[in-house]
Amino acid sequence: MSQTPLVTEAEITAEGLKPQEYTEIVRRLGRHPNRAELGMFGVMWSEHCCYKNSRLLLKQFPTQGPRVLVGPGENAGVVDLGDGLRLAFKIESHNHPSAIEPFQGAATGVGGILRDIFTMGARPIALLNALRFGDLKEAKTQQLVKGVVAGIAHYGNCVGVPTVGGEVYFDPCYAGNPLVNAMALGLMETPEIVKSAASGIGNPVLYVGSTTGRDGMGGASFASAELTDESMSDRPAVQVGDPFVEKCLIEACLEAFQTGAVVAAQDMGAAGLTCSTSEMAAKGGVGIELDLDKVPVREQGMVPYEFLLSESQERMLFVAAQGREAELIEIFQRWGLQAVVVGRVIAEPLVRVLYRGEVAAEVPARALAEETPLYERECPKEPPAYVQQARQWSVDQLPLPARSPAEILLTLLATPSIASKAWVYRQYDHEVQNNTLVFPGDGDAAVIRLRGTAKGIAATVDCPSRYVYLDPYEGGKAAVAEAARNLSCVGAEPLAVTDNLNFGSPETPVGYWQLANACRGLAEACRALQTPVTGGNVSLYNETIDSNGQPQPIYPTPVVGMVGLIADLQRVVGQGWRATGDAIYLLGLPLTTPLSDPRLSLGGSEYLAQIHGLVAGCPPQIDLDLEQRVQAVCRYGIQQGWIASAHDLSEGGLAVALAESCLSGQRGATIQLPEGTYPRWDALLFAEGGARILVSVPPREQVAWEAYAQAQLPNAWTRLGVVNGEDTELCIDSCNNSPLIRVTIKELDLAWRSPLPKYLD
């Protein structure tokens, strides 16, 4: 083997490898790698595949719990729902591909996350997505939104999996680097959970699914780099998906897993054949010999480098029980899919690649998949300058706006991040499979029926990214708390988390400070709320290079996907008022809380950003003890049948939450603010903070409800008013009975429904 370099410095750099990493590769191999081997290391040592900058931080996440069956390290996490039911779930990002080719980038993001689910032996039952875009007034943003939403809709609708929920936010920081995070859930259909560790020396290795082409070349390395003008034309790095092939692949895989002939399975996602062979071999402590001449192709003249790095979609790798490969091949051929023996499990712990009868690459499996670089960076002790400057702002510097409270409420409802997302979710089929009980826009979380039982599951994705930007630690806590609160608002007990960490470069002090502190906040909140992390995704280098050559990172955006269990589907509520005469209560921090209390703040609020054009101040601190108690009271009230509706207070504070419940229920509300409230009406109506939920309760339940609330939440519940009738108005009066807001449902509706169609139709 060669002792002189077989590749150029330019080729090393093009693979995303640093000089010291190349030196380490040479040391590990005892020789210089050839071009194919360099490509294998390039993708497997990318941040996207090996988490070299984040793995040490992820170790602080709690990963075990009484319901956790599979934690981090497999294709998806799995939790026990009781009665023999098991739920697989996972979130993944497809940010960089979606920036380049929005339709295919988003579509293949959906396809990839679905494969993670059914590779475990679970049938996909639901999809959610968390999307971030730039300023909606910009033509480029409009093009991205249309492409991404169409791609998600196309793939999910064609494959027959409902898209049941998600979130969409707009901020200029995402202009050049949108975020497309897709989450999927599935119910286990196989007796045993299908794992990915190869075993059984001599067992055949099967390639199943679609053919291999040059699409998606080096996608994992591409996903670990900053976006530049050059990379924006890098379309070969974007995969092309076929949802109809994926649908056949789902059915064929689930049928194959039922036979017991599959020893291990791995989907070919990022890094394609390289990742699937090296991960399966490394996890099993064995090796895999792969013959590229047997791989089904869709393009001629492909060389080993292209075979190994292709990210063509809808492909899987199996290890089969020896002698049973024909049985599996028959199943896949019956579904119209490729199925070929392309290799075997070997005792030497290597990935050995054959091409035209010769060894084209030979690399220790653990060097690619387990013993990858790990960077321990020093986290700055002092917050960066932008945070220190933001913390100097105080509410005393803020003049009361000249506009009326009603005008400001309507303005906030018309901001794209708060406005109705019906334009988005009406393109998704959220009813296919006929198990969706709470539709997008109707509740704080999606609810899916578990057929044959009285149970349901709820799911949500959340991240207050402006909070995380201003205070990553509190923002990380807030992301977990809001996800759990949203589940609690439909009556679900939060079970577990899958996280998607979208950040800028960890190689800058600011970037690493944001990442490290957000992880600390996420970990603390997950422990406090008893929602272990079962896996997830890290997407770093979400930056665009501006015209001056300077990287412009996104807001740090750790999206929390959370699942919950509903014991009785008869006890599920939405966010809209249900009946005239129902009393309206605020759970959590009372409106008499002084603005000096750090748990309530205009800092980092939607009001401050949209009305005053300021991103400043300290976001609200999360009181995890109060959060637990408020959520538990809300869940119990729903389970007892006392609560008719529940909605958490998030962007826009009290006034926006009241308006959203009016809009969802198409009923008005009469609100009388209690005595002793703070004097600033803007803070009273629009300040934000955790652990706050609006609930409505029918008259016949109010005595029992109030007794329970007082016992469990003394001084942390407030009766605010009453639901006042269909198609009426939202009336909010101050404590001295002077009217603050009088807005009809029609006015609210017009402001809230118009923004997205205005820019996107």
From Swiss-Prot:
Binding site for Mg(2+) 2: 116, 267
Gene3D superfamilies named among the record's database cross-references: PurM-like C-terminal domain, PurM-like, N-terminal domain
Annotated protein name in UniProt: Phosphoribosylformylglycinamidine synthase subunit PurL
Similarity comment: family membership: Belongs to the FGAMS family.
GO molecular function: ATP binding; magnesium ion binding; phosphoribosylformylglycinamidine synthase activity
UniProt binding sites for substrate: 93-96, 115, 239, 311-313, 539
Enzyme active site: 48, 94
Entry annotated with the keyword Secreted: no
Subcellular location: Cytoplasm
Assembly behavior: Monomer. Part of the FGAM synthase complex composed of 1 PurL, 1 PurQ and 2 PurS subunits.
Residues involved in Mg(2+) 1 binding: 92, 537
EC number: 6.3.5.3
Assigned GO CC terms: cytoplasm
Biological role: Part of the phosphoribosylformylglycinamidine synthase complex involved in the purines biosynthetic pathway. Catalyzes the ATP-dependent conversion of formylglycinamide ribonucleotide (FGAR) and glutamine to yield formylglycinamidine ribonucleotide (FGAM) and glutamate. The FGAM synthase complex is composed of three subunits. PurQ produces an ammonia molecule by converting glutamine to glutamate. PurL transfers the ammonia molecule to FGAR to form FGAM in an ATP-dependent manner.
Source organism per UniProt: Thermosynechococcus vestitus (strain NIES-2133 / IAM M-273 / BP-1)
Enzyme class: ligase
